[in-house]
Structure formats: structure tokens, C-alpha cells
Amino acid sequence: KWKVFKKIEKVGRNIRDGIVKAGPAIAVLGQAN
């Protein structure tokens, strides 16, 4: 039970990190178009 929760938490953190890293790039692309 706790292992599943830990796995979901880890995936969620990875997704959030990805959004944080991709955010500026998306903003730049949006301004460029």
C-alpha cells in the first residue's frame, strides 16, 4: 500500500519538475509564434 503511494508521489514530483523545466520553454515558443 505504502509502496504504491511512494511510487505515485515520485511520478507526481517528476511530472511537476518537467512542467517547471518546460514552462519557460513553452512561454518562449508562445511569444515567438
UniProtKB/Swiss-Prot annotation:
Transmembrane domains' residue ranges: none
Top-level taxon of origin: Eukaryota
Modified residues (5-hydroxylysine): K21
GO terms classed as biological process: antibacterial humoral response; defense response to fungus; defense response to Gram-positive bacterium; innate immune response; killing of cells of another organism
Inducing or repressing factors: By bacterial infection.
InterPro entries (alphabetical): Cecropin
Keywords for the protein's UniProt record, in alphabetical order: Antibiotic, Antimicrobial, Fungicide, Hydroxylation, Immunity, Innate immunity, Secreted
Tissues with expression: Hemolymph.
Any Pfam family: Cecropin
GO CC entries: extracellular region
Keyword Secreted: yes
Subcellular location: Secreted
Function, in words: Cecropins have lytic and antibacterial activity against several Gram-positive and Gram-negative bacteria. Also has activity against fungi.
Family (UniProt): Belongs to the cecropin family.
Subunit structure: Monomer.
The protein's name in its UniProt record: Cecropin-B
Annotated organism of origin: Heliothis virescens
